């Protein structure tokens, strides 16, 4: 019976002492994994940032192309009254005071340049 107690006590002491080293090793492994995880997260963050910048550049490029190719909107055609201070005549037209017809309206009209 005494040998069983001694054996149990010996196994208990060994388990506790080896368990402590395992705990320290586990803690060190966890620290290494978190450091690796941080570096992986930094890498993933940089990769995502690059993709977002590329996407933003493409979107800005499409916007600039669209504005270059879009036609002029809400402009006043030839022979239509316009405001002298805020002419909205289409391209190729100028807001001028009429020479012959329309002088009694005291208004400006869009004419070709």
Curated annotation (Swiss-Prot):
Chloroplast listed as a keyword: no
Q: What is known of its domains?
A: The presence of a 'disulfide through disulfide knot' structurally defines this protein as a knottin.
Main role?
Answer: Probable ion channel inhibitor.
Extent of the signal sequence: 1-21
The protein's matches in InterPro entries, at most eight in alphabetical order, are given as: Toxin_22
Q: What is its main location?
A: secreted
Q: Which family does it belong to?
A: Belongs to the neurotoxin 14 (magi-1) family. 01 (HNTX-16) subfamily.
User: Where is this gene product found?
Assistant: Secreted
- Designated name of the protein: U11-theraphotoxin-Hhn1a
Any keyword Secreted? yes
Please describe the organ and tissue distribution of this protein's expression. Expressed by the venom gland.
GO cellular component assignments: extracellular region
What disulfide bonds does the UniProt entry report for this chain? 75-90, 82-95, 89-110
Gene Ontology molecular function, alphabetical:
sodium channel inhibitor activity; toxin activity
- State the UniProt keywords alphabetically: Disulfide bond, Ion channel impairing toxin, Knottin, Secreted, Signal, Toxin
Q: Which residues are annotated as pro-peptide in the record?
A: 22-74
